[in-house]
Curated annotation (Swiss-Prot):
Keywords: ATP-binding, Hydrolase, Methyltransferase, Nucleotide-binding, Transferase
Miscellaneous field: The genome of this virus consists of three linear, positive, single-stranded RNAs encapsidated in separate virions designated RNA-alpha, RNA-beta and RNA-gamma. Three proteins (alpha-A, beta-A and gamma-A) are translated directly from these genomic RNAs and the remaining proteins encoded on RNA-beta (beta-B, beta-C and beta-D) and RNA-gamma (gamma-B) are expressed via three subgenomic messenger RNAs.
Lineage: Viruses, Riboviria, Orthornavirae, Kitrinoviricota, Alsuviricetes
Residues that coordinate or bind ATP: G838, V839, P840, G841, C842, G843, K844, S845
Protein name (record): Replication protein alpha-A
Domain Alphavirus-like MT: 81-305
Length: 1139
């Protein structure tokens, strides 16, 4: 026991621990080395784990490692880093402001909370916090405010005009800001400005006191102020909070504590700033900032520190100083009006508080410093490091009287300035003191030691004399006899001091050399007399029922799991449970078969008075559809009746094809079904083939999803670095914390209407044997405007879910199930089919606009963008309201999915780009509309309908041209003269086998150019693609498009400016560059068996210039660039094609 005590005493000694650490770190073979390394590793691992769980904040500024460490120390709750991608003045102040904003926002709730940010950076909120309701009050009260507004406007324009992807909600706010600024400008010019005009969505130009922004109903209201209350009187601030119904607000401001004890100027070390008190105002400025500083009223500024109670007309607020971080004071202001009522009820008449403001740490001391000023001695006080002063005092105490020397002391102080000796080594610590202060400190310590030695000698002499003789009567009674009252003594001292000054003598105060501790805090007392007034604030109710249910469910799952594990370990399973064990799985399967179809049917049924339960009626759910493929109107509510449906494999394995609705089960793969039998009616054959094509598409898409699930099961998808087919994302309920596996999808990657729900029952070699179930289920997403949440509402909380490209809309499945019923009732009937066969740019859409009686006829389009454009043109020209336009101008998918009153009726309808879709789909449109006449717009020379299912051949995808009325249009308003000549020379357009001449109204004569291996301006790889922002880029293949996007988007080209030829059909652009990046032959490349339509579409999208860039000299390049090609043909040859 004694030895243990000795060891503990030794270890507690600083020099022993230093030697131990030195030995352990220098001697690798020492056992202490392993112990030290293990301990350090444990500490590092602990720090890493804590850092992972912390919120990551990138301050972005270019700062030093010491400054970054200061930020980390000030905000330990964040994992602070810097990408060093920005630079500017007062960088540390900017970094602290960013972290202060995050810290204040973390103090307030997120869900259904409206935050006023007084004077906040609205663009920063708009860019980084688009998911929160934050409104900034940014009035223009000075020239600097106007400059700050324009700076933020420029930053917004720079970001919005950049190449990065942006959420849709950001675009909406961007447009609103520009509209609001235009309205404000108009109001100022007209002299009709008021608070309503200055209001805005993202920010307003009113002061916080005058802000009129309406808060969404049911939202909690709060406010933050990041360095913005300096010029707002605390009484006005509290009154504004009361008017807006804000019960608690948070803020922060720069605060040098020394200003409370009268220090007129000083530094703000954390932000590298300074403050100066002058003429009743306090000024702040920064060391490395040449810009204008900030000046504020000192009295109003100090009220935020000195006051605890803020008395206003209709209530009382209390200010709580929470903490100091760096040079910033955080505060909280709370509505405490309710306390007045409570205290009045209890008979209390007043309330009193005190608070202590910390000033300085105990690491410094106040030292008197001496200097000459105009031939007189000047004494000042300095705040110097305690360590340096104590080291200097200890050093001079060791010297003998004859060795006392100011020069030696200065030498020593200079050597130990901001350092001390530890374990035989010099350790740097603190801030280095200036040389002039070192010199003054040496004089002070020298004089102090002289005076102290004199005092010590006097004390010793006194006691020596007293101890040499015995006390007598005089010694005993002398003090009593010569007693002088304090009043007379004081008078004598004053007379003595005056006489000495009269004769030129000075009385020296021996306490002048004393070194004192500085003031550590300032105590502030505040009192308030209880007066009952104002109204008591009430809080907003937030419905957190779902979160509570989820918590209880997780707790129940934990308890059930613990009980089952304990029963399995102890073997305490009851006999009844053992007997029921074999029956559990069959019972589950029966319940699924009985309950799930009814549930899915109810969720998918179209909304009607007889169907009270649908997806919209579920609280908190919002059906979502793709913004590129769905319609705005009510017909987009896709439904799928499950009753009477069968799995795909049951239809596919039959000998003869019988169309029947498909259910959601996809737990088995299957081959393609047999083709439908051919009848004598071309139109009926087309209908049957379109249904067959839709069925094959569903089978193919589901097989692709099962392949992705198979990759997931075999751990081929094991991290977010792996490129997942179909852009699939997996969500798991297998753990206690459900969530996305590997990677959370971004806001642009969500919005799927369906997901595949699956789980595994065994670990087998075959996927179908391993699956417990696998089915398609509807899901919903929370929406706010165009913003979509990243986690959907799943119908069940177990197993796995996968969303991918094939579950975005599932239109093939929905359309097939809709048309099965239509096909069963349809009969062959005569239809008049007229085709307007026009060259590119002949005005087919304009012809629809001019010839269609939209109130009696219907317009159907193949693509969403073209149909939307056509609908808007109808609304402008025919003065249609939105409801009528949405009802009678439809996309193909929208019409085929519609039911009941959502389907318009018409004897005749127009079909834009009819040859890009299957002829059977057009027949079904006629059946649903009840039409007998079809006026179709198309171009037989351009791209036809493309079969997306491999392994099947379509025979009835085009109209029966022998029974079709064909009306050719050979005049274009788009293509230049050389393109018209080229289309005519290559005989792309014929009428009854006779080549036709294509003409154009475009005055541009030469537009076709080419670059290849042998051209003067060579093109051999992707790196040779010219970068132009006013150009649209085309490719033949999707793989080429992706390569082009990865090369051009980082260089400023927009994503929308790159597409395949098939995607660009119907589009018009001024300048076009067509790129071929693969040398290997392909049937759609120029010269291939299917290349003609691609050449026609690719060369006819432009109005000014077309450049073909190919890595090989194919047919199109030779047609343009070869000797005798278009590029060398005289311009006068093209003039005959221009009218």
């Amino acid at each position: 026991m004694a030895s243990d005590e000795i060891v503990r005493n030794l270890i507690s000694r600083e020099e022993v621990m230093g030697n131990l650490i030195s030995t352990a770190s220098s001697s690798v073979r020492s056992p202490l080395h392993d112990v030290l390394c293990s301990h350090v590793r444990t500490i590092v691992d602990s720090v890493d784990k804590k850092a992972v769980s912390r919120k990551h904040e990138d301050v972005r500024r270019n700062i030093s490692s010491e400054e970054l460490q200061m930020l980390i120390n000030a905000y330990p709750e964040y994992a602070v880093s810097s990408s060093a991608c920005e630079s500017g003045t007062h960088s540390m102040a900017a970094c602290f402001r960013f972290l202060e904003t995050e810290y204040l926002l973390d103090m307030v709730p997120m869900k259904e909370t409206f935050v006023y940010d007084i004077g906040g950076n609205w663009f920063s909120h708009m860019k980084f916090r688009a998911d929160r309701e934050i409104h900034c009050c940014c009035p223009i009260l000075s020239m600097r405010d106007s400059e700050r507004l324009e700076t933020r406007m420029m930053a917004m324009q720079k970001y919005m005009r950049g190449s990065k992807d942006k959420p849709l909600r950001l675009l909406s706010r961007y447009q609103n800001i520009l509209r609001e600024q235009a309205a404000r400008t108009t109001a100022f010019m007209a002299g009709e400005v008021n608070a309503g005009v200055l209001d805005g969505d993202v920010f307003c130009e009113n002061t916080f006191q005058d802000c009129v922004r309406r808060v969404p109903e049911g939202f909690l209201k709060t406010a933050i102020a990041v360095h913005s209350i300096y010029d707002i009187k605390v009484e006005e601030f509290a009154s504004a909070l009361k008017r807006k119904g804000i019960t608690q607000a948070y803020g922060c401001f720069l605060f040098p504590p020394a200003v409370l004890i009268g220090q007129k100027e000083g530094i703000l070390p954390s932000v590298d700033g300074h403050y100066l008190v002058e003429n009743g105002r306090i000024k702040f400025f920064f060391a490395n900032d040449p810009n204008a500083g900030y000046s504020h009223d000192l009295k109003d500024y100090l009220k935020y520190v000195e006051k605890t109670y803020v008395d206003i007309e209709d209530g009382v607020f209390a200010i709580e100083l929470m903490q100091m971080r760096g040079d910033t004071m955080f505060f909280k202001i709370t509505d405490v009006t309710a306390a007045m009522y409570h205290m009045k009820y209890r008979g209390m008449k007043r309330d009193e508080t005190f608070k202590c403001i910390p000033l300085l740490k105990n690491s410094s001391v106040v030292v008197p410093l001496f200097s000459w000023d105009n031939r007189s001695l000047k004494i000042t006080s300095g705040l110097l490091p305690r360590t340096l002063v104590e080291q200097g005092a200890a050093f001079i105490m060791k010297n003998k009287e004859k060795d006392l020397n100011v020069a030696v002391l200065k030498n020593y102080l200079s050597a130990v300035n901001n350092s001390y000796i530890f374990n035989g080594s010099q350790v740097r610590d603190g801030v280095k003191i200036a040389p002039d202060l070192i010199s003054k400190l040496a004089v002070t310590l020298y004089l102090r030691e002289k005076v102290y030695r004199q005092r010590e000698n006097s004390i010793i002499s006194y006691f020596e004399q007293e101890m040499l003789h015995d006390p007598n009567l005089k010694a005993m009674f002398g003090d009593f006899l010569w007693f002088v009252p304090n009043t007379l003594s004081s008078v004598w001292k004053n007379m003595r001091k005056s006489l000495m000054e009269w004769f030129g003598y000075a009385e020296f105060d021996l306490t002048t050399f004393d070194i004192c501790d500085p003031v550590l805090y300032v105590e502030i007392v505040d009192r308030y007399k209880i007066i009952q007034k104002g109204r008591i604030p009430l809080g907003e109710f937030f419905d957190c029922h779902e979160e509570c249910e989820n918590y209880e469910l997780r707790e129940k799952e934990k308890n059930d799991l613990a009980v089952k594990m304990a029963q399995k370990v102890t073997g305490t399973v009851t006999e009844c449970e053992k007997d029921l064990g074999p029956l559990v799985q069959p019972i589950k399967e029966i319940l699924v078969q009985l309950v799930m179809p009814n549930l899915v049917r109810a969720l998918c049924r179209p909304r009607s008075p007889t169907s009270p339960l649908d997806l919209k009626s579920i609280p908190g759910s919002t059906p979502s559809h793709s913004s590129s493929d769905s319609e705005h109107s009510m017909t987009e509510e896709a439904s799928c009746t499950i009753a009477g449906s069968v799995p795909t494999w049951e239809i596919a394995t039959r000998k003869d094809l019988t169309f029947q609705r498909i259910d959601e089960d996809m737990s088995r793969r299957t081959g393609m079904p047999p083709r439908p039998k051919v009848t004598s009616s071309y139109n009926m054959n087309a209908r049957a083939e379109f249904l067959y094509y839709q069925l094959c598409s569903v089978i193919c898409e589901r097989a692709q999803i099962l392949s992705v699930i198979e990759d997931f099961r075999q751990n081929l998808i094991f991290s977010d670095k792996v490129a997942v087919p179909l852009n699939a994302r997996f969500y798991s309920f297998q753990s206690l914390r459900p969530g996305w596996v590997f990677k959370t999808p971004s806001h642009s990657e969500v919005g799927h209407s369906y997901a595949v729900h699956f789980d595994f029952k065994t670990i087998g070699t075959d996927l179908e044997e391993s699956l417990a179930f696998c089915r398609m289920v509807p899901i919903s997403w929370d929406k706010s405007g165009k913003y979509i949440a990243t986690t959907p509402h799943f119908p069940e909380r177990h197993g796995y879910y996968v969303i991918c490209d094939n579950t975005k809309l599932c239109n093939n499945w929905l359309i097939y199930n809709k048309l099965v019923d239509v096909y069963a009732l349809v009969a062959d009937r005569p239809l008049r089919f007229e085709l307007i066969d026009g060259v590119p740019g002949c005005g087919k859409s304009t012809m629809i606009l001019n010839s269609c009686d939209i109130r009696r006829e219907v317009v159907v389009g193949e693509g969403r963008n073209a149909t939307d454009d056509l609908r808007e043109r109808f609304k402008r020209k025919k003065n249609l309201n939105s409801k009528t336009a949405n009802h009678r101008v439809r996309t193909l998918d929208s019409l085929l999915l519609a039911e009941g009153p959502c389907v318009p009726q018409a004897d005749r309808f127009h079909f834009d780009e009819a040859l890009k879709v299957h002829y059977g789909a057009i027949m079904f449109c006629a059946d649903k509309l009840g039409a007998s006449e079809i006026l179709a717009q198309g171009d037989r020379a351009q791209l036809p309908m493309i079969c997306r299912v491999e392994g099947i051949e379509l025979q009835f995808q085009s109209p029966d041209y022998t029974k079709t009325i064909i009306n050719p249009k050979l005049r274009s308003y788009r293509i230049p003269g050389d393109v018209a000549f080229y289309l005519s020379a290559k005989e792309f357009y014929k009428v009854k086998g006779i080549p036709q001449k294509v003409i154009t109204s475009n005055s541009v004569k030469r537009s076709l150019y080419a670059r290849g291996e042998t051209t003067p301006e060579r093109f051999v790889s992707l790196l040779d693609v010219p970068v132009r922002k006013d150009t649209h880029y085309l490719t033949f293949l999707q793989a080429e498009k992706e390569s082009l996007m990865s090369h051009l988007i980082p260089k400023g080209v927009k994503k929308e400016s790159i597409s395949t030829i098939h995607e660009a059909q119907g589009g018009t652009y001024e300048n076009v560059i067509l790129v071929r990046l693969q040398r290997t032959p392909n049937e759609i490349y120029p010269g291939g068996p299917r290349s003609a339509p691609y050449i026609v579409v690719g060369t006819s999208r432009h109005t000014k210039t077309f450049t073909y860039c190919s890595v090989t000299d194919d047919k199109l390049l030779l047609d343009i660039a070869d000797v005798g090609g278009i590029a060398h043909t005289p311009i006068r040859t093209f003039e005959s094609h221009i009218v």
